[in-house]
Design a protein with these regions (language model features):
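Alpha/beta-hydrolase fold catalytic core
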Residues: 1-53, 76-77, 290-301
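Conserved alpha/beta-hydrolase catalytic His-Asp/Glu region
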Residues: 175-228
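Short beta-strand/loop motif that positions the catalytic acidic residue
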Residues: 232, 238-240
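Flexible "cap/lid" loop of the alpha/beta hydrolase fold
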Residues: 131, 135, 141-171
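Acidic catalytic loop of the alpha/beta-hydrolase fold
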Residues: 243-247
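Conserved HGGG/HGGXW glycine-rich cap/lid loop of the alpha/beta-hydrolase fold
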Residues: 37-91
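Catalytic histidine-centered segment of alpha/beta-hydrolase-like enzymes
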Residues: 269-282
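Active-site loop/oxyanion-hole signature of alpha/beta-hydrolase fold enzymes
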Residues: 81-121
Length: 301
């Protein structure tokens, strides 16, 4: 056999092994070890041939929170959800971490699952992780979706009451408290239906140790993407709500203006419309991720 034929055969064998491994690993929820870090993950197979979508959640939220959005997303898209260390079902790490550490961990997760490249969607705290992944693991990241997120410590902040409320995980632990504060904290649909927010947070979220929440807060301490955004070269969809007390709307405009290949879409609603009204945003996200070539940047509205 010629060296060319051997190379082709080896390549085919490699991809066949990867495909077989992916097929074996497609279970609902399981724990995998990436390096030395256990991660609780869930993989939804897709019917298409594109790269998978990594979903990075907000602070304190486990992978189950994405269930309503997942049901509305194009089934062609393979989806990988994960609990960051210390959240949901992922064990508490030995020490705090930074966003760069988590981005490297996600690259290792892709290796473990046999994927060369992925898209990433991040909401709120997870949007910071998505930006970091796109910047520090740029060859592994094809497209980016940023939902209700900002640029870290250098951004237009929420009001002091909102920041103080976010400093603890109480809303994940006390359903009555969640109902009382939902409208003022999350805005949008939560103002009219705080019980829906309480239902999502308490039905779909698996609460981890309180120290895990503190580790997430520590990861964002001192972090900003602002000076690096011109280096984020992937096509990016920025989704921002016009009634978001946690991430004021202007922060989405800042992101879209500094990311070279970004388009901005402003939706009517608050911080967690992605899971409260998934039909509002899932079609836009599905179209962006499945189109052959993303369109030109747009200022949105």
């Amino acid at each position: 056999m010629s060296s060319t034929a051997e190379s082709q055969s080896g390549g085919e064998s490699l991809w066949a092994r990867r495909a077989a491994r992916r097929a074996r690993q497609r279970s609902l929820t399981r724990t995998v070890v990436v390096g030395r870090t256990p991660l609780r993950i869930a993989v939804r197979p897709g019917t298409g041939s594109g790269p998978p979508l990594l979903l990075a959640n907000g602070i304190g939220a486990s992978l189950e929170t994405f269930e309503p959005f997942l049901a509305a997303l194009d089934p062609a898209i393979e989806v990988i959800r994960f609990d960051v260390p210390g959240v949901g079902g992922s064990p508490l790490p030995a020490r705090p971490y930074r966003f760069g550490t988590l981005a490297h961990l996600l690259a290792g997760l892709l290796d473990h699952l046999g994927h060369e490249q992925a898209d990433i969607l991040g909401i709120s705290w997870g949007g910071a992780l998505a930006q970091q992944f796109a910047l520090s693991e740029r060859r592994r990241c094809r497209r980016v979706v940023l939902v209700a997120t900002g640029t870290g410590v250098l951004m237009v902040p929420a009001n002091p009451w909102v920041l103080a409320t976010l400093a603890t995980p109480r809303r994940y632990l006390d359903r009555g408290y969640t109902r009382r504060i939902a409208g003022q904290l999350y805005g949008g649909t939560a103002r009219q239906d705080p019980e829906q927010v309480a239902g999502v947070l308490h039905r779909w979220t698996r609460v981890g140790p309180s120290r895990g929440y503190l580790y997430q807060l520590a990861a964002g301490s001192g972090w900003t993407s602002l000076p690096l955004l011109p280096l984020l070269r992937q096509p990016t969809l920025v989704l921002t709500g016009d009634d978001d007390p946690i991430i004021p709307h202007v922060n989405g405009r800042i992101l879209a203006s500094l990311i070279p290949h970004a388009r901005l879409h402003t939706y009517h609603g608050g911080h967690v419309e992605l899971v409260l009204r998934p039909a509002l945003l899932a079609p836009l996200i599905s179209e962006f991720l499945t189109e052959t070539e993303p369109g030109p940047p747009s200022a949105g509205r």
